[in-house]
Amino acid sequence: HAILAPEEYTFGRLFHQAVDGSPANPGNTVLVMASNGHSSTSLAGGTKLSRATNVGLAGVLTDGRLRDFDELAAEPFAAWCSGEAVAWGGAVVTPFQANIPVVIEGVGIYPGQYIFCDSSGAVVIPDSDIDEVLETAHQVRADDSASRDLIAREGRNEGLTRER
């Protein structure tokens, strides 16, 4: 095991390096943390991640676990992880670097890449595809809205014969 200088490898220090190194508006930024094989270990919790609120991040994404779901649910940012941990993870993992490529669930993620997350999960969108993906997403949203309007107006028997 390597000995790391504790004052250099702190969550707070590397959190701010990651956020300050992002060219995007913090409100459009997701902090991505790789567990590097420790996916059952807590990488952070409500106290450490309160920094995300302080700087206005949109969310946090990790393949590891997070703690304090009740606290995180009250925060204005979204959090995606592999599950909730009870125990503090600092005895197992320590932050090491910021603004480097990481691998989450077999997917390479590079600083500045587009990530879309919702309650179903997260998707990394290649830079070369962003315009097409956004255009398609807007069309899907419009189609869904039109379908909801149609469903809201349908009669009782109509709903039995229509696909949606």
Give the location of each predicted region:
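Channel- or pocket-lining gating/hinge segments that regulate access to a cavity or pore
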Residues: 121-123
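Feature captures the catalytic cores and cofactor-binding loops of soluble hydro-lyases/lyases
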Residues: 1-111, 125-157, 162-164
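Beta-strand-loop-alpha-helix segment that lines the small-molecule cofactor/substrate pocket
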Residues: 118
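C-terminal binding/interaction regions
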Residues: 115
